[in-house]
């Protein structure tokens, strides 16, 4: 059977802005750090500007997408792979 497509799963730690809506002293606000975020997903595209991760697939579409600026990524590590075949998306094989 012909292989449909393979995607690779990654763990990604990245830096993001942080915000707060409460009132606080200016001196306390000046000490607020950036946020370090963690994303685990399938990397479907990367270039010098961005990494695109998704978590859900149909035979043609993706969902649960996050686009992370490449410059914000601190650590990225490949943790697995998944190969999808045409039969994986045959609705009839899942019906009761």
Briefly describe each language-model feature range.
Residues 2-96:
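Conserved RNA-binding domains used in RNP assembly and mRNA/RNA metabolism
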């Amino acid at each position: 059977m012909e292989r449909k497509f393979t995607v690779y799963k990654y763990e990604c730690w990245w830096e993001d802005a942080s915000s707060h809506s409460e009132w606080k002293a200016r001196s306390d606000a000046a000490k607020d750090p950036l946020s370090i975020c963690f994303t685990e997903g399938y990397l479907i595209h990367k270039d010098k500007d961005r990494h695109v991760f998704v978590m859900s697939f149909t035979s043609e579409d993706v969902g649960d997408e996050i686009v992370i600026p490449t410059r914000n990524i601190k650590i990225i590590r490949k943790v697995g792979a998944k190969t999808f075949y045409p039969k994986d998306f045959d609705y009839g094989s899942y019906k009761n």
